[in-house]
Every structure is written in C-alpha cells, then in structure tokens.
Amino acid sequence: MELELGLRLALPSPSPSPATATAAGSELDLLNSAPGSCRKRGFEEALGGFKTDDDNDDGNGRGGDGDSDGEMGNKRRKLVGWPPVKCLHRRRDGGCGGGYVKVKMEGLAIGRKLDLSILGSYAELLDTLHLMFPSTNQEDGHDRRRRHPYAVTYEDGEGDWMQVGDVPWEAFAKSVKRLKILV
C-alpha cells in the first residue's frame, strides 16, 4: 500500500525508488530543492502572464494612467447584479402585493412570518395573529378587546410605524414591511 501511493517518511534520496519514479517531475524538483528555496507563487506567476482589465488600476476607480475625464471616464462600467432581481420582480408583479412579512410580539424573542396574500381583510389578519400568538389575558371588557387583546402596528415602505386599520386593506397589503404586536 505504501509503495502504490508513493508515501514515505524519509527524505528523498538521489536515486528515487520505482514507486516514486511515477511522480510528476515538478514534485520531485520541489522535494530535491534546497531548504528555504520553496516559496508560494505570486499572483502574476499563478495566472501565468494573464493580464486583467484592472492591471492599470491606481485605486481611485478611474483606471491607471491618471485620466480623470479621458477614455476611461466616458466608459460606462457594468454593475454586477444590476438591476436587483428582487426589486425587478416586485415592479413586474405590481408591488409587494402582500407577500410574507415578519411578525414579532412584544416580549417574545422569536418572531414568525405571515403570508398576507392569503388574507383578504383586517379581520382575517387579526384572527390569524390571534391564532399565531394566543393571549393569556382573559379580562372582561369590550368584545373587541376580549377577542383581540393587543394592538397591532406595522412598518410601511417609508419606515413609519402606523396602527393596523388606519388605511384601506389594499394599500396596507402593498406597503407593509413588518408587523409588531403590542401587548
């Protein structure tokens, strides 16, 4: 087994054994070289003389030769990943249209996700939230308070926090980013 793989612990001798004779010449050269002469290859050596587009780059994003408004300034650089696919799909589909939103309840460390596209009204949303986060508060009071004992707020597309029910359902479903349940 040791001879088939060409593995051994001793330093290589000037006359290689038949098992190591099948090894590539470059590997033998590395083994027989003087200590300290082995080094890692540089970037240019590893690429084998391959020239990249940004070899003349001076780090300022315009290219090498210092032309600020020259040839390189007029060329338009292609952005990788542009346009963002997620935004493109949203625009094509006509907005968010009630996809998944994150739902967090005050006092709980773990949130959940809710698909707004299967819901059609605020009443369905509140019932679903009540099933997702059951309340232990069994106070007597108003019928709505007993049925939904917490306030629900949402963050819209502009980053403002608003109370659920302030805008029509369609506008809410298109603008909501996340929901927060306040106890």
Curated annotation (Swiss-Prot):
InterPro entries: AUX/IAA_dom, AUX_IAA, PB1-like. Aux/IAA proteins are short-lived transcriptional factors that function as repressors of early auxin response genes at low auxin concentrations. Keywords: Auxin signaling pathway, Nucleus, Repressor, Transcription, Transcription regulation. PROSITE patterns: PB1 (PS51745). Expressed at very low levels in etiolated seedlings and flowers. Homodimers and heterodimers. A motif (EAR-like (transcriptional repression)) lies at residues 3-7. Induction: Highly induced by auxin. Residues 1-23, 42-77 are annotated as: Disordered. It comes from Oryza sativa subsp. japonica. The keyword Transcription regulation applies. Gene3D superfamilies: Phosphatidylinositol 3-kinase Catalytic Subunit, Chain A, domain 1. It is found in: Nucleus. Residues 98-183 form the PB1 domain. GO terms for biological process: auxin-activated signaling pathway; regulation of DNA-templated transcription; response to auxin. Belongs to the Aux/IAA family. GO terms for cellular component: nucleus. This is Auxin-responsive protein IAA20.
